[in-house]
Amino acid sequence: MNASSVVQPLLTRGMKAVLVSQFFSAFADNALLFAILAQLKAQFYPDWSQPILQIVFVLAYILLAPFVGQIADRFPKDRVMLFANSFKLLGAFTICLGYDPFLGYALVGVGAASYSPAKYGILVELTDGDRLVKANGLMEASTIIAILTGSVVGGFLSDWNLAIALLVCALMYGIAVVANFFIPRLSAVRRDKGWNLKKMLTDFASACCILWHNKGARFSLIGTSLFWGAGITLRFLLVLWVPVVLGISDNSTPTILNVMVAVGIIIGAGAAARFITLKTVHRCMPAGVLIGVMVVIFAVQHSIWASYVLLIILGIFGGLFIVPLNALLQESGRQTIGVGYAIAVQNLGENIAMLLMLGLYSLVIKIGVPVVTTGIGFGTLLALTITSLWIWNRFQRN
């Protein structure tokens, strides 16, 4: 055993602080979403407006994509995370004070867009090598546990008292802000970068091109974009599927079903960290195809207990699929354009996929397609798309 392995364990003080900050920030993100959805339902907004809420959030990611990567690399990432969580806190308070929920959630989106490159980029500064996959596994597990608890708390509190639900979300963002102060001060990776707007846009476009021409990065970008686009669409599909198929109209049941997915992703993320390395990352592809298959199976059944089991299995496949792809992209970014830029490009791809999938989903619901039919079509399309990516990637490697 060498000295570096003794003095640099995976769970350092900095890593623990990052995980705590991520947990409470993600907790609030998910609780707030379900609280606002309950607010929209209480105020009789149409069903198709629900995905519009997420589209407003996603637009912040897309519009800020050329800039947040440079911010993450230009400033210490611990300070960037602090600023981003503070902006989320501002958005939550805006909603608590009675302002338009779409406006408040857009402010939360600005904070989230700034936060993402820093939270993943900081992992590279706190660990390295194959431990990066394990660090990503911990980050994903922390995030999914937050989704699990945040979704449930958001749903149950919204059924009980909507105002308290919103205040709890703001409190959780406040705790995340405090946790950021316990992350050791880090140095900026690329302090020499300037702030010329035209150059930033040009640099970002160049970064997109560099990553796209890297086989590993391109594969990861497409895979993670499909995963998160599908994941957020499934979340809204569940909100409509539950009352139609199960006949349950509360706010907590859809959150519990989302929790089942989260439990599965925790298991899958742990398995990915244990059995998949950067050299064997392509083992994740069968799991990606099976995500779509599980969506189809889930959509056509009518049992709440079967729903729990099917969504846990779906989540396991999701964890096995996403964790190796995230690690592959970060490693590709470190070798080319910097992790901050790489994560910003990844966010752009993922959020464009979310925007397109949510827009299509909103349109399908607006024109009256039954929710079960929507689920079958969604799962089939996802499975076929990931299968095509798998075949295309094998062709590229050969």
From Swiss-Prot:
It is found in: Cell inner membrane. It is a multi-pass membrane protein. GO terms for cellular component: plasma membrane. It comes from the Bacteria. The keyword Coiled coil does not apply. One of its GO terms (molecular function) is lysophospholipid:sodium symporter activity. Its main location: membrane. It holds the Pfam family MFS_1. The keyword Transmembrane helix applies. InterPro entries: LysoPLipid__transptr_LplT (IPR023727), MFS (IPR011701), MFS_trans_sf (IPR036259). The chain crosses the membrane at residues 17-37, 52-72, 90-110, 137-157, 163-183, 226-246, 256-276, 285-305, 309-329, 352-372, 373-393. Keywords: Cell inner membrane, Cell membrane, Lipid transport, Membrane, Transmembrane, Transmembrane helix, Transport. Belongs to the major facilitator superfamily. LplT (TC 2.A.1.42) family. Catalyzes the facilitated diffusion of 2-acyl-glycero-3-phosphoethanolamine (2-acyl-GPE) into the cell. PANTHER family: MACROLIDE-EFFLUX PROTEIN (PTHR43266), MAJOR FACILITATOR SUPERFAMILY (MFS) PROFILE DOMAIN-CONTAINING PROTEIN (PTHR43266:SF2). This is Lysophospholipid transporter LplT. It comes from Photorhabdus laumondii subsp. laumondii (strain DSM 15139 / CIP 105565 / TT01) (Photorhabdus luminescens subsp. laumondii).
